Structures are given as structure tokens and as C-alpha cells.
């Protein structure tokens, strides 16, 4: 796992190709130029909107907080975890995707947008 850890705007994240970070598009977060997507593994569904994300998180017992006007926040009573994402889906970046992956083990994963869909194991 190669890369550089970058601290920017109060967030620590791993950048695979630090030289291309400034020229990368908003959705890939510096991941080598390929666009990434968040995938709900059990269904194979790509999270293309916050409606999809919220539905899948609710299925797992996450509840939405309605207090912050700039963020969508989700909390699970059985843990101390808090998922925070920008209210504007166009600002949903790779660092937010990996935050969700870490806090919902084996339920979501980040894939290349062009990668073929993998059918869920039965």
C-alpha cells in the first residue's frame, strides 16, 4: 500500500499520487486519476445519492442527526462512531467514502467507477 499521508483542513488522508492531487477531479480525491464510487457490497448497488446512502445506513441501524446545516450526520447508538458527509453530494469525496467503509465493516467498499460489478456472494 503505497502513498503519502496528507493533513489538510483538519483531515488526514492517504494520497496515492501526491503530484496529481491538485489536478484531480473532485470525486477521485487524488486516487491516481480514476474516479471512485462507494458500493453497497451485499446488493452491489452504487451509492449515487444521499438517498441511497441514508437508506442503506438505516438498514444497519444508523440514525440521522438533523442539527448541522452544512453536514449530514449519522450515528449508531451501539457505537461511538459518527459519519459526517457534506450536505452537497457533489462534494462527497474519497475521504468520506473510506470513512463510511471503516465504520461499516464488510458492508461498503470503494471501487473504480469503471470496474465491472461483482455479484454478491450467496
Curated annotation (Swiss-Prot):
Record-linked InterPro entries = FPF1
Q: Name one GO biological process term.
A: regulation of flower development
Stretches the record annotates as Disordered: 16-36
Family that this chain belongs to: Belongs to the FPF1 family.
UniProt name for this protein? Flowering-promoting factor 1-like protein 3
Species per Swiss-Prot/TrEMBL record = Oryza sativa subsp. japonica
Amino acid at each position: 500500500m503505497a502513498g503519502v499521508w496528507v493533513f489538510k483542513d483538519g483531515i488526514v488522508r492517504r494520497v496515492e499520487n501526491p503530484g496529481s492531487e491538485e489536478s484531480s477531479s473532485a470525486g477521485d480525491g487524488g486516487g491516481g486519476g480514476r474516479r471512485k464510487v462507494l458500493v453497497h457490497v451485499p446488493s452491489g448497488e452504487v451509492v449515487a445519492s444521499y438517498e441511497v446512502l441514508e437508506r442503506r445506513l438505516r438498514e444497519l441501524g444508523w440514525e440521522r442527526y438533523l442539527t448541522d446545516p452544512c453536514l449530514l450526520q449519522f450515528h449508531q447508538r451501539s457505537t461511538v462512531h459518527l459519519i459526517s458527509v457534506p450536505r452537497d453530494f457533489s462534494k462527497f469525496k474519497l475521504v468520506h467514502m473510506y470513512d463510511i467503509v471503516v465504520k461499516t465493516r464488510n458492508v461498503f467498499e470503494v471501487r473504480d467507477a469503471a470496474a465491472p460489478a461483482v455479484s454478491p456472494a450467496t
